[in-house]
Amino acid sequence: MSKGPGPGGSAASSAPPAATAQVLQAQPEKPQHYTYLKEFRTEQCPLFVQHKCTQHRPYTCFHWHFVNQRRRRSIRRRDGTFNYSPDVYCTKYDEATGLCPEGDECPFLHRTTGDTERRYHLRYYKTGICIHETDSKGNCTKNGLHCAFAHGPHDLRSPVYDIRELQAMEALQNGQTTVEGSIEGQSAGAASHAMIEKILSEEPRWQETAYVLGNYKTEPCKKPPRLCRQGYACPYYHNSKDRRRSPRKHKYRSSPCPNVKHGDEWGDPGKCENGDACQYCHTRTEQQFHPEIYKSTKCNDMQQSGSCPRGPFCAFAHVEQPPLSDDLQPSSAVSSPTQPGPVLYMPSAAGDSVPVSPSSPHAPDLSALLCRNSSLGSPSNLCGSPPGSIRKPPNLEGIVFPGESGLAPGSYKKAPGFEREDQVGAEYLKNFKCQAKLKPHSLEPRSQEQPLLQPKQDMLGILPAGSPLTSSISSSITSSLAATPPSPVGTSSVPGMNANALPFYPTSDTVESVIESALDDLDLNEFGVAALEKTFDNSTVPHPGSITIGGSLLQSSAPVNIPGSLGSSASFHSASPSPPVSLSSHFLQQPQGHLSQSENTFLGTSASHGSLGLNGMNSSIWEHFASGSFSPGTSPAFLSGPGAAELARLRQELDEANSTIKQWEESWKQAKQACDAWKKEAEEAGERASAAGAECELAREQRDALEVQVKKLQEELERLHAGPEPQALPAFSDLEALSLSTLYSLQKQLRAHLEQVDKAVFHMQSVKCLKCQEQKRAVLPCQHAALCELCAEGSECPICQPGRAHTLQS
């Protein structure tokens, strides 16, 4: 007994033996395939009739909702033929109403919604490999749960052939063997590869990655509508949802357009008012083949089965991409024609990012570029692409389309707030670790102790001014230096940043918990703190040309990383919005009287006189700042030499960044207010619409009641006209328009009615009072019944006095 929906029976007597054997052979079907072949869209949805189906918009229901969505079950009869053709469409079928004059017995294919009769036919269902990937649930990202194409070899099924097709195949093969295997077993995979091979033979450039990235789905298909048999493997688009804007002509980000994509569903690109000028993706094809995303993820089919049916049209990587090296040496960064090198994104004057090769003569020093970018508050990730973008493989970094400018494909101005506070700490740490690996430590001769200080100095050099990590690590270094004895450290340049400078983000907008977690990830061993404190145990005479800060030596040109709070000499108060990292905070809490004599001598003062300044520094050093010559926001540094201009420039850029952030905040507030106002208007409009609907329903009910009443009155009027009762006479001016027979009939009717009236008048006169004509007559003393009792009291009998009676009657 066959498990498939098409029962196999005895073939026609004229069929060849081989074809008869294949028809008689049962086609086993998997349970999932059997369910779809037998029941998909063949019955009406019972929930939709009750208006309870939740899969109507978008329409993903297993059953049909409207008649034009109904699918006839495909059956192979006992004679080996199908109940309707899998290829020839019916010309009488109405796609709007879903009706055909032949009904279900029509031998041709009906073009239902989604072309379900052909896709789910025994001949084609799950016989071809789908070129789209699957999501986390195993469903097709393009066609959803009910995809009619196979996702993997385990989902393939062999097609069921019509006996006439089998006879034609056998006649074509002329008795060759192994026909069944080539038809039944290899048809699905071979058909997919054959279609791609045909396309590649027509246009060999489709094998080039750059050509696919620049031209795939950018031109309309040259074949007539509904005649393209290449399916989704066709490199040309067939509708607006399949179209991809050419990256040569249009610049757009890899993010989906909010006007087109809602949730997981891609809508009509025509809903976007900006059209092709929109800076976001409009279709899934545009997003997958965007230069920032293209080939950035491994292909699932290649990982699972080792082959991909999409071939060169696959948007995912088929070859294992080598990871970027941790140590980017100049020799490895040289670009070659075969394999372009990685691209660094330099900020240009226009605010965009320009790709520059590390080996280019215009490429700046990595550490200088990193420090510059970090000081602006927007750290650039040297280990990959800029923040917020997906890292591309090395072989796609340098792709530039013909006729394009030098701008990188993803070089767009970032939207306000693209760097959230919870990402700043992690980006700083990542940049620091990259810088620690990239920075050569053997560029100049150093003393034995100098490399121990360098990691923390480098950390301060790559962090932006006033950032949470800058103030925290600066306070950490200062606390460590203040709590240890002097050491013979040689003169070195400490690129410490100003801790009193305002942070790039306002204090109220900084998420302290995120910075705390970022600081917890810091490996203090990378800074050489243990070796640094060990080195400080060796006490020697300090260098005469340096400044003594709590037992350490700093060059006079370097800023002092201490906040401007000069009132306290026993503790360190950080101006950073995040909690400072203090390595030796317990030393700062010790009273000044516990300092040893050697320390007092080294500091050049006596603890008993209370002349020690902040953190044990000689108070004479702070005389320049205690006089109030500097504002509270000015850092306690020596503003002289070439560093003053650089500091002024950094402050100016910081002010510009702060003003830009304020403008973004104002714009965001205005947009939020406008959105709130629109939302309120929409709610009010909805309420008014509901009220109008209720009023309309009430008016409709009143109208129906009035119509019923009018109908009743019309029926009553017709009944009166048809009965024997007297009718209202028409206008006298209309009598001449009536026919003579009508006038005779009217005259006869009126005479009959007049006789009835006379009889009624005579009867009423015989029983009513002759005087008042209202009360009934009563018997008078004269035995006459002419007057009522009331009239008889004041009047005499009119019968006894005829003259009186005549007067009464007159």
From Swiss-Prot:
Protein's cellular compartments: Cytoplasm
Comp. bias regions, Basic residues: 241-253
A Gene Ontology cellular-component term: cytoplasm
Stretch list, region Disordered: 1-24, 239-265, 324-343
Presence of the UniProt keyword Coiled coil in the record: yes
Zinc finger motifs (RING-type), residue ranges: 766-801
Span of zinc fingers (C3H1-type): 84-113, 124-154, 215-241, 251-285, 293-321
SUPFAM superfamilies in UniProt: CCCH zinc finger
Coiled-coil segments: 643-723
Listed Low complexity bias regions: 10-19
Biased composition (Polar residues): 328-338
Phosphoserine, modified sites: 240, 374, 378, 385, 631
Pfam families on file: zf-CCCH, zf-CCCH_11, zf-CCCH_UNK, zf-CCCH_UNK-like_4th, zf_CCCH_5
Keywords from the named record: Coiled coil, Cytoplasm, Metal-binding, Phosphoprotein, Repeat, Repressor, RNA-binding, Translation regulation, Zinc, Zinc-finger
Biological-process GO terms, alphabetical: cell morphogenesis involved in neuron differentiation; in utero embryonic development; negative regulation of cytoplasmic translation; neuron migration
CDD domains reported in the protein's UniProt record: RING-HC_UNK (cd16771)
Transmembrane segments: none
Protein family according to the UniProt entry: Belongs to the unkempt family.
Protein name: RING finger protein unkempt homolog
Species of provenance: Homo sapiens (Human)
